[in-house]
Amino acid sequence: MIFGLLYGLGLRVGEVSRLCRKDVDLDKAVLLIRQTKFGKDRLVPFGPRIALAISSFIERRESGLGPIPPDCPVFSFAKDKQKRIRPTTISWTFHKLLPELKLVIPAGVAQPHLHCLRHSFAVGTLLRWYRAGINPATRLLDLSTFLGHVSPSSTAVYLTITTELFECASQRFAQFAAATLKEVVR
């Protein structure tokens, strides 16, 4: 569930670690992310698949440990419901699980780190916009706000070009260039 929130919503590991039960509103399908990296709070909406996953996780946890009090962390250790799972523990677990994925990492390329899930969310969002015919430039401020960045320039750092993203951007540019060229020739 933790990795699903990191990848599926582009949350920072500390934000997931600090989530309390009162921060999860399943009826409104929104998370309240408190005291982000820049000391602000933000609301992060989520869709039906993530809603189902969160709901199922909370139900399973409560069936084993009892109700989660509002101020208790969503992700805690079984022995102590008050003790949240620390970001370092989440990162350590991620690195322990990496070999299970059997990723082929080319020589000279660094092994993925936990924050790559956030980068993947940002790039995936751009890809979805391209495929839906949405101009990403008009929505970059939305993505920046969603990720809790102070400006779109902070978000741009996350937007690593991938082959798939390059192909989508190239197709969009080719369409733009063809339309512009037709008007110039007239």
Feature locations, PLM:
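Conserved catalytic core of the tyrosine transesterase superfamily
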Residues: 1-186
